[in-house]
Design a protein with these regions (language model features):
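Glycine-rich phosphate-binding loop and adjoining helix at the ATP-binding site
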Residues: 1-41, 168-178, 183
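Glycine-rich phosphate-binding loop plus the immediately following alpha-helix
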Residues: 13-23, 77-112
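Glycine-rich phosphate-binding loop of actin/hexokinase-like ATP-binding domains
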Residues: 37-95
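Conserved phosphate-binding/catalytic loops in two-lobed NTP-binding clefts
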Residues: 13-20, 116, 169-203, 210-219
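Short, active-site-adjacent cap segments at secondary-structure transitions
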Residues: 25-27, 52, 164-167, 200
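Adenine-nucleotide phosphate-binding core of ATP-dependent small-molecule kinases
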Residues: 92-95, 102-170, 188-197
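Generic structural signal for well-ordered alpha-helical scaffold segments
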Residues: 28-33, 135-149, 177, 206
Length: 219
């Protein structure tokens, strides 16, 4: 569900009202005071139950023609038939999210009751099957990062959210840059995890709300 052409300001006569996508707020937070500070071009991806994202181009939040730029629902694979929460099939979110990790675990273990906790704990303890499941999930993330890097040529991709703490950023960065450098003269991009992203995002939404959702920094 969503709102279009709704006058939120009419709900409050005393305070100015600003409405913005939370992932866009997070992307701007990282750009202003977080892991991608000082980098004019960056992509922020939140890995949680779902996947969110925001794109900074030339120091401006890029929103696209309808405000939907940065939604991580681009199609990953043909005919895999994994249904996404958006209703489509085989979106990046359906593979790269925590929900996607569970689904990958179900498929590889043949256990419908497996949880993300089971997989991460097993991987950390050296269980081979759980490690294989986790690595498969991480490679789904990698495929998305390679595509985004080819499209936007960012200085950095920042991963945040509850699942980001478990990924191997050195592996993701190395493999992403191997793919793009062998096919072009692009400079390498960095991949970072911001484990303090939630507190940073809250601060930026509170302190820089006017700058964030006004016309000052928007494209």
């Amino acid at each position: 569900a969503g709102y279009s052409d709704f006058d939120f300001q009419s709900l409050s006569s005393k305070k100015r009202v600003y409405v913005e996508n939370d992932a866009n707020c997070a992307a701007w937070a990282e750009h202003e005071i977080g892991a991608s500070k000082g980098m004019p071009n960056s992509i922020m991806i939140t890995l949680g139950t779902g996947v969110g994202g925001g794109i900074i181009l030339n120091n401006k939040l890029f929103k696209g023609k309808s405000g939907a730029a940065g939604e991580m629902h681009f199609k990953m694979y043909p005919d895999r038939r994994r249904k996404c929460t958006c209703g489509a099939y085989d979106c990046f979110e359906s593979y790269a999210s925590g929900t996607g990790l569970k689904k990958t675990g179900e498929e590889m273990s043949k256990n419908p009751d497996i949880t993300t906790y089971d997989i991460v704990e097993g991987m950390q303890k050296g269980d081979k099957l759980m490690t294989d499941i986790f690595n498969t999930w991480q490679d789904h993330i990698l495929a998305g990062l390679i595509g985004l890097t080819d499209l936007f040529d960012p200085d950095c991709i920042v991963l945040s959210g509850s699942m980001a703490q478990f990924v191997d950023t050195d592996y993701l960065e190395q493999k992403t840059n191997e793919e793009i450098i062998v096919r072009s003269l692009k400079q390498p991009s960095c991949v970072k995890v911001d484990i303090d992203g939630n507190s940073i995002n809250y601060t930026i939404e509170k302190e820089l709300g006017i700058e964030l959702v006004g016309d000052i920094k928007m494209k």
